[in-house]
Regions:
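Conserved catalytic alpha/beta cores of large enzymes that bind or transform nucleotide phosphates
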Residues: 228-251, 258
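C-terminal active-site "lid" helix and adjoining low-complexity regulatory extension at the edge
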Residues: 4, 9, 245-261, 268-275, ...
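Conserved N-proximal alpha/beta basic substrate-recognition cap immediately N-terminal to
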Residues: 10-125, 140
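Short, solvent-exposed loop/turn segments at secondary-structure junctions
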Residues: 138-140, 176-177, 208-210, 281-282, ...
Length: 322
């Protein structure tokens, strides 16, 4: 049974319009009525701590009560975070400047704090590069992060002022991906997301952004091989990458053992944060940490066998306690 605080918060946050939209989606893909779906979504929110997005992502209308109980829902994921991570360290992950300092041993790309730099410093940082990455210090994932094309830019005083006015106070070198990653994803942004529990990798996926599409494909964390086709934000399936036409299934991520090693070594940095998500790029000769979070997003778990992952996570928690 979900705890009362969670239920009260979810009821407060619930949007009837969104719930009706979710119920209509369930009706369109199954034989149940919209009214039945709406009541079932509400029931699952209370009984399994599942939001309507959980319901849609995990096709709850097709699951038995036992299967629903075994699914990692929003409430279950929140419980993992509360159990394994100290909230006192949230600020380390919410401010990229603190984050980069904390994980500096896993970051090799040049990074500049534009607030502390002059226009001449910014010009020197850009150098001959046509593109750089700019971020808000509190950026979450790809939100608040942009690739900036500087072709023809000569007024760096104006550029600096405009960036700061938009809150984009961090500048970074654009990383060069491994050739094999480019063969799969082309020039689209691609990162490996690795989740660790008690310093051991339990989940991995590829995330490739192409235009408005955000494609996610599961990776076997032991072998580095993609185990199925990719899903987009609406759970549409992509057997091939739309930019390169290469198959997702069966693709082996290069330098895989180095990727997992980086994530597991990085998970040791903060002993009181035991449930971590690491976002890693694969460069030509090594992996590079791009971002980290103390609140791994559970919606990525929809691409794998969710119940198997839940047992794996809870076994890691149990092993540590015992």
């Amino acid at each position: 049974m979900a705890d009362l605080d969670y239920i009260k918060n979810r009821i407060r946050e619930m949007s009837l319009t969104s719930m009706l939209s979710a119920a209509n989606s369930v009706q369109n893909r199954s034989n149940v009525s919209t009214v039945h779906a709406l009541f079932d979504i509400a029931k699952c929110g209370i009984k399994y701590s599942a939001g309507y997005t959980d319901y849609l992502n995990n096709a709850f209308e097709t699951k038995t009560p036992d299967e629903r109980r075994e699914t990692i829902t929003r409430g279950v994921n929140n419980a993992y975070v509360r159990k394994l991570n100290s909230p006192d360290l949230d600020s380390c992950f919410n401010d990229k400047r603190q984050l980069y300092a904390l994980y500096r041993d896993f970051i090799s790309r040049d990074i500049m704090d534009i607030e502390k730099a002059s226009a001449d410093n910014l010009k020197a940082f850009v150098g001959d590069n046509v593109k750089i990455v700019v971020r808000k210090p509190d950026a979450k994932g790809n939100d608040g992060t942009f690739v900036l094309n500087l072709f023809g830019v000569n007024d760096f005083e104006n550029l600096r002022e405009r960036l700061l006015n938009m809150g984009l106070s961090l500048a970074e070198r654009l990383v060069t991906q491994h050739r094999e990653m480019e063969r799969l994803c082309g020039e689209s942004v691609a990162v490996i997301r690795v989740v660790t529990v008690n310093n051991v990798a339990v989940f991995a996926c590829l995330n490739s952004v192409y235009g408005k599409l955000k494609l996610t494909a599961p990776i076997n964390e032991k072998t580095g091989v993609i185990t199925s086709s990719a899903l987009d934000q609406q759970n549409g399936m992509f057997h091939r990458h739309p930019l390169t036409d290469r198959r997702f299934y069966g693709f082996k991520i290069p330098l895989w053992h180095d990727v997992i090693s980086l994530a597991e070594r990085a998970s040791l940095v903060l002993s009181s944060v035991k449930y971590c998500g690491f976002y890693i790029a694969v460069l030509p000769d090594k992996p590079e940490l791009i971002d980290a979070t103390s609140f791994p997003r559970h919606d990525y778990y929809r691409v794998c066998d969710n119940s198997v992952l839940r047992r794996k996570i809870e076994q890691r928690i149990s092993n540590e306690i015992n």
